[in-house]
Design a protein with these regions (language model features):
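Conserved catalytic core of nucleotide-sugar-dependent glycosyltransferases
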Residues: 106-168
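A glycosyltransferase accessory/donor-loop signature
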Residues: 1-8, 18, 40, 53-54, ...
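Short, polar loop motifs at secondary-structure junctions
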Residues: 41-48, 99-100, 211
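Active-site regions of enzymes building and remodeling cell-envelope glycoconjugates
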Residues: 51-64
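A short, glycine-/small-residue-rich helix N-cap motif at loop->alpha-helix starts
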Residues: 64-74
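GT-A fold catalytic core of metal-dependent nucleotide-sugar glycosyltransferases
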Residues: 59, 72-125
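Short, acidic, metal-binding catalytic loop of nucleotide-sugar glycosyltransferases
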Residues: 27-35
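A short, glycine/small-residue-rich beta-strand->loop->alpha-helix junction that serves as a flexible
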Residues: 12-21
Length: 279
């Protein structure tokens, strides 16, 4: 049985998501003891230096549906069809893997599809997002985080992604029918996936409060700081050690770190990640 991580990256005018994916791949190579394969789905050019870190570089299947949109999420439903693995963990590009998560694979292999539904702040406290998740709360939808989920090649996962394709391609109609309160005027994978989980009756099986799946979420409104703070990385000290440990405000960060800020991956951080991956 093949197991691996998959990330979909499409650069826009301001953000180099391919470099973020490279940084994530380096962190996976540095931290994972058992499963460290990562494949990149992209139509963007991948620098030669980056290419060797990826198990496979896969073109986006069925044409590019994202066009000129800023967030480039329109192709995410294709991940199921593009993954080269029997079992896949899907990640967002703007993340770093800081510790071995072999136990996650062990846990997830008992299921066809599993979503993260728990996030923490950099102080390692569990947080509930009431700022960005008003539509979830108002419409009683499951607390799905698409940025971290697992699936195995199975009928359940295939059907989930088929319905996801429909909801992505008809998101305004779908939101009108399933998320009409606190109406969201843009396509979001979290809300879309939550609607699909709910429609398919997967809430009990695809989400689990006791699941090990979690990540540290650095969206500023979740950090409990005064409103008006813009950048977390210029507000608290950040230190990435040469062996790939990340400290924020002198607190060592665990497992999976979702840094969110688009300019977080500097040349010096890339160098340290390269050293850790080659170490």
């Amino acid at each position: 049985v093949s197991k691996g991580f998959v990330v979909l990256a499409q650069n826009n005018k301001t953000v180099d998501y391919v470099t973020q994916a490279y940084a994530l791949a380096l962190s996976i190579k540095a931290s994972q003891l058992e499963y460290n394969s990562i494949s990149l789905i992209t139509n963007d050019p991948v620098p030669k230096k980056y290419q060797k870190i990826f198990d496979q570089i896969i073109p986006i299947p069925f044409n590019d549906d994202a066009g000129n949109t800023e967030w480039k999420v329109e192709n995410r439903w294709k991940i199921f069809h593009a993954t080269p693995y029997d079992e896949t963990i899907v990640l967002d590009t703007d993340m770093l893997m800081l510790e071995d998560i072999s136990s996650w694979w062990e846990y997830c292999s008992n299921y066809d599809i599993k979503f993260c539904s728990r996030i923490k702040n950099y102080k390692l406290d569990v947080v509930e997002d009431k700022v960005h998740r008003k539509a979830f709360i108002a419409n009683n939808l499951p607390n799905v985080y698409f940025a971290l989920h697992y699936f195995k090649k199975s009928d359940t996962a295939y059907n989930f992604y088929k319905v996801l394709e429909f909801v992505c391609n008809n998101w305004e109609w779908s939101y009108d029918h399933f998320a009409v309160k606190e109406y969201q005027k843009w396509l979001s994978m979290d809300l879309t996936a939550a609607i699909v989980v709910d429609m398919m009756g997967l809430t009990e099986t695809a989400l689990d409060k006791n699941s090990p799946l979690e990540f540290i979420h650095m969206k500023v409104p979740l950090l409990g700081w005064p409103t008006g703070t813009v950048n977390w990385s210029s507000t608290v000290p950040v230190n990435l050690t040469s062996n790939g440990h990340l400290e924020v405000a002198n607190i060592r960060q665990h497992k999976l770190f979702h840094y969110v800020e688009k300019d977080f991956i500097t040349k010096s951080i890339l160098k340290k990640l390269e050293a850790a991956a080659n170490g």
